[in-house]
From Swiss-Prot:
Functional note: Catalyzes the conversion of 1-hydroxy-2-methyl-2-(E)-butenyl 4-diphosphate (HMBPP) into a mixture of isopentenyl diphosphate (IPP) and dimethylallyl diphosphate (DMAPP). Acts in the terminal step of the DOXP/MEP pathway for isoprenoid precursor biosynthesis.
InterPro entries, A to Z: LytB/IspH (IPR003451)
Lineage: superkingdom: Bacteria
GO molecular function, one term: 4 iron, 4 sulfur cluster binding
GO biological process, one term: dimethylallyl diphosphate biosynthetic process
Stated name of the protein: 4-hydroxy-3-methylbut-2-enyl diphosphate reductase
EC number(s) recorded for this UniProt protein: 1.17.7.4
Pathway in which the depicted protein is active: Isoprenoid biosynthesis; dimethylallyl diphosphate biosynthesis; dimethylallyl diphosphate from (2E)-4-hydroxy-3-methylbutenyl diphosphate: step 1/1; Isoprenoid biosynthesis; isopentenyl diphosphate biosynthesis via DXP pathway; isopentenyl diphosphate from 1-deoxy-D-xylulose 5-phosphate: step 6/6
Residues engaged in binding isopentenyl diphosphate: 69, 158, 290-292, 352
Stored HAMAP family: IspH
Species assigned in the record: Synechocystis sp. (strain ATCC 27184 / PCC 6803 / Kazusa)
NCBIfam families per record: ispH_lytB (TIGR00216), PRK13371.1 (NF009911)
Residues binding (2E)-4-hydroxy-3-methylbut-2-enyl diphosphate, per UniProt: 69, 158, 223, 290-292, 352
């Protein structure tokens, strides 16, 4: 953990925490979310990956995917000569992994098929899967034993959901309430079977039949999805099956377990508190492919707060310029992005973002504001 403390923790962040999550410098007030950044599962996974290199200094090391959705952390592993499995035409290529190699499974987990392949090659496996993800796997396995179809709230191409679905029997992945409603409408009223299958083409188990496989359901989720939406989806399916089969038969048709990750929930709750403040803008820090970070940005956008999503302080500058990712769009450049005069900036970060990265972003914001009067005079 010594390396973790040196590389990822921040004295400035500790000071802000102790000052009621508030920092005031000149024209800038920074309000930090009361829950943000590295969660326990991420910290555990990164520490285990580092310790694996120390424990196997001369061995060839692999990791089946990004350890977490943070570019700086993954780059650090590459510098430690941890090899990432190549993806060729959308498929992982394990041909380079030899018998006896050491293979790290990331925080999101790995599919049953990948684990079997690595076992067959007699690899040494270091499993850093977050226990909250394992909890979801246990839930879908219970669905499978009871011959229930798993309705998984998640993104069908996200590593965690790919792994979770591999533990399920029959499954269907829904991205949001709109897709859940589409499924529930089919349960109650039927519809065009082929149209349904085409719509969910990449999001169901092999041989899925909506006329046969939507009778008994269990709900699970990708742990980083928006808590409130997962809860609404669960209630929608319960209400739909209650309407179709009645209260006496409901328990034979519907299973639900709480698989919402505590850390995800805490960060979202803290964000809902933060957006109630009088903010000039919101800065959300985390990997662009990070699901939990994107959901934090959604909360700011839904509350009408101007927000920028960046993955590191390198996106800021030179000058009063930022390269950021608006919700649902590609990278854009915003210049100027910090308004003149007194501003209050809300700051949060995803569960895969180290405190050091948050500190770097804050320091750049402060530097821009300190230089602003000079820039204005020069202009």
């Amino acid at each position: 953990m010594g390396v973790m403390n040196t590389e990822y923790q921040s004295h400035l962040i500790q000071e802000i925490r102790q000052n009621n999550y508030r920092l005031e410098r000149g024209d800038v007030t920074i309000l930090l979310a009361e829950a943000f950044g590295f969660c326990w599962g991420v910290e555990r996974a990164v520490a285990m990956a580092y310790e694996t290199r120390q424990h196997f200094p001369g061995d060839r090391l692999w990791i089946t995917n990004e350890i977490i959705h943070n570019p700086s952390v993954n780059q650090r592993l590459r510098e430690m000569e941890v090899n990432f499995i190549d993806v060729v035409n959308g498929e992982k290529d394990f041909s380079g992994v030899a018998k006896g190699d050491v293979v790290i499974l990331p925080a999101f987990g790995a599919s049953v098929e990948e684990m079997q392949l690595l076992n067959d090659r007699e690899c040494t496996i270091v499993d850093t899967t977050c226990p909250w993800v394992s909890k979801v796997w246990n839930s879908v396995e219970k669905h499978k034993k009871k011959e229930h179809t798993s309705i998984i709230h998640g993104k069908y191409n996200h590593e965690e959901t790919i792994a979770t679905s591999s533990f399920a029997g029959t499954y269907l992945i829904v991205l949001n309430m709109a897709e859940a409603q589409k499924v529930c409408d089919y349960i109650l009223h039927g519809g065009d079977r082929q149209e349904f299958l085409d719509y969910f083409a990449n999001a169901h188990s092999a041989g899925f039949d909506p006329d046969q496989d939507l009778v008994r359901l269990g709900v699970a989720n990708q742990t980083t999805m928006l808590k409130s939406e997962t809860e609404m989806i669960g209630k929608l399916f319960e209400k739909t099956l209650l309407q179709k089969y009645g209260p006496i038969e409901l328990n034979n048709h519907f299973m639900s377990f709480n698989t919402i990750c505590d850390a995800t929930q805490e960060r979202q709750d803290a964000m809902f508190d933060l957006v109630e403040e009088d903010l000039s803008l919101m800065v959300v820090i985390g990997g662009f492919n990070s699901s939990n970070t994107t959901h934090l940005q959604e909360i700011a956008v839904e509350h009408g707060i101007p927000s920028v999503h960046i993955d590191s302080g390198d996106r800021i500058g030179p000058g009063n310029r930022v390269e950021h990712k608006p919700l649902g769009k590609d990278l854009e450049v915003l210049e100027p992005w910090l308004p003149a005069g007194k501003i209050t900036v809300g700051v949060t970060s995803g569960a895969s973002t180290p405190d050091k990265v948050v500190e770097e972003v804050m320091k750049k914001i402060l530097a821009i504001k300190e230089a602003q009067p000079v820039l204005e005079i020069a202009g």
